[in-house]
Amino acid sequence: KKGGNIIFVTPTQRRRFDDATHSRIQETHGDYPDAMRAVAKREDVPVIELHDMTRTFFETLGYENSKKSLVHYPANTYPNQTKALEDNTHFNPYGAYEVAKMVVMGMKQLNLPIVKYLRADWKDFNPAQPDDFNQFVWYPSVNQDVTKPDGN
């Protein structure tokens, strides 16, 4: 009744590279992405393929540089953060910004009606050509807290 539209979005990859060459992302979601695609096809629901795009993104950045898109920070980067953070699942601001661009590209590829609301200066994004991490600027909030909602 409210005019909403269902869109499936496959999960982002985790940063888990193969042990031998550290060049290929390994699957960590099992059958889940394929199950999503099957349900979407059966129900005629559009699917944004973050699963494939984030694999390309991580593999393009490579084993070491891909850490720059995730919550990988040495101890004492933030107040009250006494231990190093090495989270291969959750994106930092740079990574989240890149993933947001992937979502927009997915919407464009599907030609979803919402794309008409994109800014006129939007520039298309290719996860095989990510933005330079060293050029990315995100100013931390003065009210930052590294405590997880369920505690640390």
Indicate residue ranges for each PLM-predicted region.
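Structural recognition of the beta-strand scaffold that forms the well-ordered cores
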Residues: G4-T10, P46-E49, H90
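Long, non-globular segments of proteins
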Residues: F8, D34, G106-L110
